[in-house]
A protein has these predicted regions:
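Active-site neighborhood for divalent-cation/phosphate handling
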Residues: 24, 30-63, 70, 74-166
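RNase H-like, metal-dependent nuclease domains and their acidic two-metal-ion catalytic environment used
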Residues: 7-9, 51, 55-59, 232, ...
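Short active-site oxyanion
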Residues: 9, 128-131, 227-229
Length: 256
């Protein structure tokens, strides 16, 4: 069955290594299309995105002639008016009750000085009672607004944090959560539905991952009988478990 495209949304996920596009198929009802672009090293993220948009099969094929006529003078895509864009820059989690929109950029740039030339966006994550502050490159924003009428940014880690918080309930043991992706570990802990700890570490080798996890474990005063939850794409999974089990009794793999 053919659908009538109107104010359709495409989801774009930008990581260190890939750009992915996910969108509803405008011809086959109920079908979702997915496409991945591998980042080219040596060029900026915005340049990679511009190339990915130019090559994206979804954007080329999902067209609506009846709308193209009405938007002939528009620079924006004739079918996908809006884009939800997940970006993977460092997060600064601010308690919702302490959030100050005017102070947010200064606070973020103080902690993440390498992003001082980027815009800072704040996205509420009400499920864990925080506002996530994160950087969005000005060039990246420009490339996106050239193609889409409306662009909504989201932190890549937001849905992961919400899911981890859900898993944190139940039982009397403390839980530490680790999300592996793109040669990085995001490590977080919760207590009574609030963020207790959240940080990210770059890792390329299993010993590095073990070191950072155990360092956080010790810093938080966690016991051998507490619970470590692992998720994501884990390189050297068995070797990692072997080392961690020397110090941590309860290790769980969870799917998010």
């Amino acid at each position: 069955m053919t659908t009538t495209p109107c104010n359709m949304n495409i989801t774009i996920r930008i990581t260190r290594s890939t750009i992915t596009f996910t969108a509803p198929n405008t011809v086959i009802e109920g079908q979702t299309d997915f496409e991945q672009y591998n980042m080219k090293s040596g060029i900026a993220v915005a340049a990679n995105l511009r190339q990915a948009l130019a090559e994206c099969h979804i954007l080329k094929t999902q067209t609506a002639p009846e709308r193209q006529t009405s938007v002939a003078t528009s620079q924006h895509h004739p079918v996908f008016d809006t884009a939800t864009v997940y970006v993977d820059t460092p997060l600064l989690l601010i308690p919702a009750e302490e959030y100050d929109e005017e102070a947010m950029p200064t606070l973020y740039h103080h902690v993440n000085s390498q992003y001082k030339d980027d815009n800072v966006v704040g996205t509420p994550i009400p499920q864990i009672n925080v506002v996530a502050a994160y950087a969005v490159g000005k060039d990246l924003s420009f490339v996106l607004t050239e193609t889409f009428r409306t662009v909504q940014f989201m932190p890549l880690l937001a849905p992961v944090l919400v899911e981890f918080c859900r898993h944190s309930y139940g039982g009397f043991q403390e839980k530490l959560f680790c999300y592996f992706h793109d040669r990085r570990i995001d490590v977080c802990a919760f207590r009574k539905g609030r963020v207790r700890f959240c940080s990210a570490f770059d890792v390329s080798l299993t010993p590095d991952a073990v070191y950072y996890i155990l360092n956080v474990w010790q810093t938080l005063g966690m016991k051998r009988t507490d619970v470590l939850c692992l998720a994501g794409s884990i390189t050297g999974h068995e070797a990692l478990l072997k080392e961690l089990r020397r110090f941590i009794k309860n290790i769980r793999n969870i799917t998010i």
